[in-house]
């Protein structure tokens, strides 16, 4: 019974291994179908089947048949796979719709390039506007009291009328009268005054009372001996200014008055190499009055002003200075002036644009409605016509320089200093104020931010267009690839069905052969088991015999051991008695 159970267990184990191998081959085939690797599937499956179902018996003819069938299937599948790959490559390498490289609407430009393009587009607008040439108007359409202006234009009354013009003149007269009545207490601000925290930084050692020059008092003055080798004074101004005017005075009698002096400025002190910026050398009059000296080229924003006395009138002992005043333009003043100029230029440009934007057709229609009293219009003799028409123009005539100011500003934004042919030095342009630099930076940031927003919008539009084109192209490619994939999959499925049928037949044959081999194997093992049973019974008998012999031997040993112990005890007792006798004898 035990032998039969063992045999049935072996058969069940072999069948489980075979089914597991078949399932593994099927899963491998299903996993590799999508990758078009059918050749690997066929070879792997045949080898796996042959490895799993290999038997001790030789099946050489069957294996050669399997390899031939597999090689034929591999060749056909390789041809189909090559055709599919060629189709896929043709689909992937299809040329996209060509783009015009010069078209900026379809190309991605950098921010700087895009900014240049936009600036050209904006600048082309006024150029087109300025390039228009007006046709001459026929003077026969003028009335009797109308005359021709400097630009061959007449007053049509669309900007001003008589009432408005008279009101404007009256307002201007009233304003001028009020301005004359007003009392002005102080026209300029003295930046070298002690009231606005101006101080004396340095003077020559012989000078006494240098701070008195900052106070408007005739009783206090800077006292300096005329024999001093260097006579100078350094004043720290209230603010950083462009020095435009200096007033200096000596009210003291019986003293020498300064004759020539040098004015220098600086933006910091102490200086590294005493690099003062010289504004000029001036010559004063020999008088006891406040003398003014204009600075035509301020050059830098000055925080410190230095006055050096070079020569004097007369030969008195003391050469005093009673008062020093410094006038100029601060950074905030210059900023406000620039703002006002920009606003005036803007208003003037708006006015000129309004005049230039008049429609010629409207003027011609207006002229047609005007009654003409000239019998024979003579366009060539304009001087006689102007003399006959004695009237005054209602519009204020625009000067030639003012008319072309906007046009010149568009073509010449930066004024360049033209060097004269004489040997005089070129005046240095004053540096810009911090407020002007800040406003320039802010305006640049504002323009850049607005341009950045528009740039991002345009780039997003370009991206959306390009994404749409890419989506359409990928849709076409994907549909083409899907058709090719379906064709290849159907062909591969047909080949796999054929291969599965062949594999099924081969596996059935192999299983039948394996069954026969298993039967032979079980019979052989049954014979071996019978022999083992006989040997086990014989060994059992030998074990029983050896066991009984061992038990007898142990019993014999135990019996003989008891006699030995008794003899040993007797000899031991005799030895002890002999030892006692010997000890007693010794004593």
Curated annotation (Swiss-Prot):
Main subcellular localisation: endoplasmic reticulum
Which residues lie in Basic and acidic residues bias regions? 63-90
**Superkingdom of this protein's organism:** Eukaryota
Q: Where does the protein end up?
A: Endoplasmic reticulum membrane
> Which residue stretches are annotated as topological domain Cytoplasmic?
563-587
Q: Keyword Transmembrane on this protein?
A: yes
Q: What are the record's GO terms for cellular component?
A: cell periphery; cytoplasm; endoplasmic reticulum membrane; membrane
Name the residue ranges with Polar residues bias: 91-108
Per the UniProt entry, what is one GO biological process? protein folding in endoplasmic reticulum
UniProt entry keywords in alphabetical sequence: Endoplasmic reticulum, Glycoprotein, Membrane, Signal, Transmembrane, Transmembrane helix
Q: How does it sit in the membrane?
A: Single-pass type I membrane protein
Q: In this UniProt entry, which residues form the Lumenal topological domain(s)?
A: 22-541
Q: Which residues are glycosylated?
A: 25, 378, 381, 408, 448, 486
Residues spanning the signal sequence: 1-21
Residues in SUN domain copies:
163-331
Q: Where are the transmembrane segments?
A: 542-562
Query: Which residue intervals make up region (Disordered)?
Result: 44-108
Protein task: May be involved in membrane protein folding. Required for localization of MPS3 to the nuclear envelope.
Subunit = Interacts with EMP65.
Q: Which family does it belong to?
A: Belongs to the SLP1 family.
PANTHER family noted in UniProt: MEMBRANE PROTEIN CH1 RELATED (PTHR12953), SUN DOMAIN-CONTAINING OSSIFICATION FACTOR (PTHR12953:SF0)
The misc remark on file is: Present with 3250 molecules/cell in log phase SD medium.
Q: What is the recorded name of this protein?
A: Uncharacterized protein SLP1
Q: Please name the gene that encodes this protein.
A: SLP1
């Amino acid at each position: 019974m035990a032998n039969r159970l063992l045999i049935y267990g072996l058969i069940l184990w072999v069948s489980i291994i075979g089914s597991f191998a078949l399932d593994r081959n099927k899963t491998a085939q299903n996993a590799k179908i999508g990758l078009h690797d059918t050749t690997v599937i066929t070879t792997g499956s045949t080898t796996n089947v042959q490895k799993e179902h290999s038997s001790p018996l030789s099946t050489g003819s069957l294996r050669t048949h399997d390899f031939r069938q597999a090689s034929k299937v591999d060749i056909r599948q390789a041809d189909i796979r090559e055709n599919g790959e060629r189709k896929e490559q043709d689909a992937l390498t299809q040329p996209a719709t060509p783009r015009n490289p010069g078209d900026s609407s379809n190309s991605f430009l950098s921010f700087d390039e895009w900014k240049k393009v936009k600036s050209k587009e904006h600048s082309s607008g006024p150029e087109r506007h300025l390039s228009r040439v007006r046709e001459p108007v026929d003077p026969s359409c003028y009335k009797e009291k109308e005359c021709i202006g400097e630009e061959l234009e007449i007053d049509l009354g669309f900007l001003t009328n008589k009432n408005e013009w008279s009101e404007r003149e009256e307002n201007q007269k009233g304003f001028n009268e009020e301005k004359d009545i007003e009392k002005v207490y102080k026209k300029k601000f003295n930046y070298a005054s002690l009231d606005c925290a101006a101080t004396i930084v340095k003077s020559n050692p012989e000078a006494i009372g240098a701070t008195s020059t900052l106070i408007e008092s005739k009783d206090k003055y800077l006292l300096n001996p005329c024999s001093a080798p260097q006579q100078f004074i350094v004043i720290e101004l209230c603010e950083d200014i462009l020095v435009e005017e200096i007033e200096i005075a000596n009210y003291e009698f019986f003293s020498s008055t300064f004759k020539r002096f040098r004015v220098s400025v600086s933006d910091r002190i102490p200086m590294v190499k005493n690099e003062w910026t010289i504004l000029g050398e001036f010559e004063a009059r020999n008088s006891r009055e406040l003398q003014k000296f204009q600075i035509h080229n301020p050059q830098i924003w000055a925080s410190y002003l230095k006055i050096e006395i070079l020569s004097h009138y007369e030969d008195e002992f003391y050469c005093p200075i009673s008062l020093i005043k410094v006038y100029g333009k601060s950074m905030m003043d210059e900023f406000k002036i620039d703002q006002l100029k920009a606003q005036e230029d803007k208003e003037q440009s708006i006015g000129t644009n309004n005049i230039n934007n008049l429609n010629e057709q409207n003027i011609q229609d207006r002229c047609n409605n005007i009654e003409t009293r000239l019998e024979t219009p003579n366009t060539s003799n304009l001087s006689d016509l102007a003399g006959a028409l004695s009237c005054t123009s209602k519009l204020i005539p625009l000067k030639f320089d003012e008319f072309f100011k906007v046009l010149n500003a568009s073509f010449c934004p930066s004024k360049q200093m033209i060097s004269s042919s004489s040997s005089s030095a070129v005046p240095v342009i004053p540096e810009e104020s911090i407020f002007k630099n800040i406003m320039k930076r802010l305006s640049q940031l504002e323009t850049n931010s607005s341009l950045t927003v528009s740039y991002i919008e345009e780039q997003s539009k370009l991206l959306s267009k390009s994404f749409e084109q890419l989506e359409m192209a990928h849709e076409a490619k994907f549909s083409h690839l899907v058709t090719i994939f379906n064709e290849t999959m159907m062909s591969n499925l047909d080949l796999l069905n054929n291969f599965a049928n062949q594999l099924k037949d081969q596996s059935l044959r192999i299983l039948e052969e394996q069954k026969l081999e298993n039967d032979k194997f079980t019979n052989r093992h049954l014979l071996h088991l019978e022999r083992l049973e006989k040997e086990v019974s014989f060994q059992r008998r030998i074990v029983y015999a050896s066991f009984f012999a061992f038990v007898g031997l142990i019993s014999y040993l135990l019996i003989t051991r008891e006699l030995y112990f008794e003899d040993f005890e007797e000899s031991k007792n005799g030895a002890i008695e002999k030892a006692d006798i010997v000890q007693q004898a010794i004593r």
